[in-house]
Amino acid sequence: MTPLTFPEALDYLYSFVDYSLQRSYRYSAEVFDLDRVRDLLARLGNPQDGFASLHVAGTKGKGSVSALMASSLSAAGFKTGLYTSPHLLRFTERILVGMEEIPEEQVARLVAEMQPHVAAVPGLTTFELVTALAFAHFAREAVDVAVVEVGLGGRLDATNVIQPLVSVITSLSYDHMHLLGDTLSQIAAEKAGIIKAGVPVVLAPQQREAELIVLEAASREGAPVIQVGKDWLYAPGAHDLDGQSLYIWSPEEQPLMDAFVESAGEEEWAPPRYEIPLLGYHQVVNAAVAYAALRTADAGGIHVPEASIRAGFRSAVWPGRFQVLSRSPAVVVDSAHNRDSALKLRIALDDYFPGQPVTLIFGASGDKDIPGMMEELLPRVSRLIVTQAVHPRAADPQELSSLAQRHGVRVETLAPVEAALARAIERARPGEVIVSAGSLFVAGEVLAAWPQLQRLVVSETAAAR
């Protein structure tokens, strides 16, 4: 085995086909062949069989749900792995054990060990290799349980070789339509591809069209379905920029909940209350989904006490999702990148910053529903700065500007992302909210630039005084 440095290991991983960098490709079983993933894992000793797992698919919210679950499992004393993608700042964010990133030297070591086995399996992709790397790390670290987030779709995703204790399907909406299908039913069918025979499914609230597809798929596999909003009920509590609370209860407790509400909280019984640092009503739903999945995992021997769920929810970290970086001026980084998440962002802005003018820093991948995102966001925006992330799929800012001008909003074009953020801060007026959205890659570049630009915020605030 030839030793590698961390940069050499990354170069090796990225030397394979990386579909995340391509705008179009064929989404089929011939291109995404799970047999080759199984072949590689078998050569590595099937590391994925060495730990319990929870599998999370969905269009939106799957990362937040995964982070909430992993944080709670860790709080309960389980040695917990967490695999997510893509990363915002560092490759090592994708693979966590005990909420700690995989060390760079471990990446280099495991990739070097994998190389001869990879050479024996033709056609592997970057994501397939990284998935195998994550499983190998989890096995090497002897984790008790891993939370595994699907990369794309579900049916043909490289993660779909695990046999989980619970399959989780979060909110489904329109994204990756050129790959997964033009209808919500087609998208739901791809996501439902993670359902395994007899393995319980936790399903987030869905549009009826998507719900029916998932229920049919689960029925075919003999997989029981736990529906959040039916089998577990939830409601938001208080919220501010520091976080929010929520209540979760069972249908059997509904009469008690009714009495609690009618008495304005004077009843002796009160529904369980949880606190999360993640903002926006959609995160209340995600927390309820995470709770239902953890409760469902009880039957598989993974018991997380209520106190651990509370502690895990309170300490969960999932950056780039309506994350407030500054309050004066207000600077919010979000990763909304389809129409549904753009709508949720607009609702969150109205909820947390009612009536305040918004400057939007917007960049998107060229394969996303850019007109749909603009239709949701631009009515709430007083000034728009279009920009471009350093990514092969990033849309041309001039094209974004042309689309935006049809909405009658003031548009400025400025790249890179760091320059766009600096301009927004320099021109911020009292009470204005600066928001970045449209792409995970834009969110990542905002977060990367923030430590330096934070000084500009301080100086601008001081000058205003």
Regions found by a protein language model. Name each.
Residues 207-217, 222, 330-333, 339, ...:
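C-terminal helical cap/extension that packs against the catalytic core
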Residues 1-27:
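Charged, amphipathic alpha-helical linker segments immediately N-terminal to NTP-binding catalytic cores
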Residues 64-68:
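Hydrophobic positions on the alpha1 helix immediately C-terminal to the Walker A/P-loop
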Residues 86, 130-179, 212-270:
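Extended acidic/charged loop-beta regions that coordinate divalent cations
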Residues 389-391, 455-465:
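Short, flexible loop segments at boundaries between secondary-structure elements
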Residues 145-150, 157-168, 172-174, 186, ...:
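Nucleotide phosphate-binding/pyrophosphate-handling subdomain across enzymes
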